[in-house]
Amino acid sequence: MNAIELKNVNFSYDGKTRILENVNIALDYGEVNLISGHSGEGKSTLLYIISGIIPNITDGNLSGEVLINGEDIKGKRLGEVCRKVGVVLQNADEQIIQKTVEDEIAFGCENLAFSPEKISKQIDTVCRLMKLDQSWQSRKLSGGQKQRLITASTLAMGQKIVILDEPLANLDTAGAEMLMSTLKSLAKAGYCIIVIEHRLDVVLPFVDKVFHVGNKSVSEITDRENYLKEQSTEMEDTCSEFSGALPVFSLSNVAFSVKERGILNGVTFDVLKGSRTVLLGENGCGKTTLLRLISRLEKPTRGVILQNIDDKFGQKSKQSKKWYQKIGVVYQNPDYQLFMPTVEKEIKFGARSGEYADEIAEKFGVKQLYARHPQSLSEGQKRRVSIAAVVATAPEVLILDEPTVGQDYRGLCKMVEVLNRIHTDTKNTMITVTHDCRCAAALCDRAVWIENGTVRHAGGKEHISAFFRLDAQCKG
């Protein structure tokens, strides 16, 4: 008996336009299954169908058979399906509701009426698997740590079918390979693991079957090597000329702590005007905190951050409003920045002009989404819209925190190409945090490697290959 079997499944949200058509697939226990495909093709819709979210929460026209352990779940309540299928969604912040790691993991187990002894055992087990401390505060976790937490919370509930929607999105290479190794071990122990993911280079060595979603259908891929080549294209790289440029930011002995927990200590480096600087480091090392300090969303506990935005080198600007208008920040979570009723209004809200907003939207491939509500988009589409909205303001300094999350390889290459073209045209300064080895070098003139809250290396892009080599060696 298959763990999951879909027979002649069709689905449309509006009753007219089919998202999936005549889908027939079978997934077994003891396997890791990869669901791949371009953004917006229906991968998440497939997840929602298998997990019972469609039609229990999300409406639409669903036909065909959706079998879990041989039983059709279309008429089942969501609570019944959830006892068989565990789901880790893309957006960690939408799933974390408790204050501590321990409470978050315990929450799902309590809803399943586990005994206190079993809950304690499950918490210990999954915390070891995911390298989490039970006492950590949920709101203080990095993006990668949050991803590991929601994965741990799902595994603790003990369903034998586990679906993960882009679980590697906020993980560095070592963390991504550690998670995939853990999932492979679970499959060998009898689980059915389903992973929806764009980072094929990391995932493929760990999976047993590969399914491609595209053109409304789902097909199994047998030639992985050619499939990887088809999904990959060469990224355009550019090199900025900034020899002799002044620092736009100069950090000297910067430290930052929350209560007694030190996050950064003695950070010193310059961001040169007109350069593309990439910040590297493992999850939780302080990269996002550095961006918040540079953009004045936080104040350093110690040290000095000098700025050269207002053509007057110093710590503070007399025209703070003007200063902030020259800084564009794209957060890790696009939901924090999407608040208008349509994509068009979102991108034009603070844009330099309506015409420029249209131009930027066209470049990022989101103009055709103008009539859509931002919150109705896929995570990859949300990311492109949030970046386009910030770029449309024409900032002198563009700060990007994990901009490629949720992008398939084609979308990633397009994003890198557009960002580099805009950088060349506007001579802006770009500061990017990324753990994505597929694009780091293509967005970089200078690299700053953060380790244990301080700068390990700062210099040219040669540090990128060194970082990812070490990152891969440190997995597990």
Task: Give each language-model segment a name.
Residues 51, 295:
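Helix-to-loop junction immediately C-terminal to a conserved catalytic motif
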Residues 59-71, 303-315, 323:
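Conserved ABC transporter NBD signature motif
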Residues 117-134, 355-369:
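Conserved ABC ATPase "signature" region
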Residues 137-145, 373-377, 381:
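Conserved ABC ATPase signature
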Residues 151-152, 387:
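Hydrophobic anchor residue at the start of the ABC signature
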Residues 162-166, 398-401:
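Catalytic Walker B motif of ABC-type/P-loop ATPase nucleotide-binding domains
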Residues 197-198, 434-435:
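H-loop/switch region of ABC-family ATPase nucleotide-binding domains
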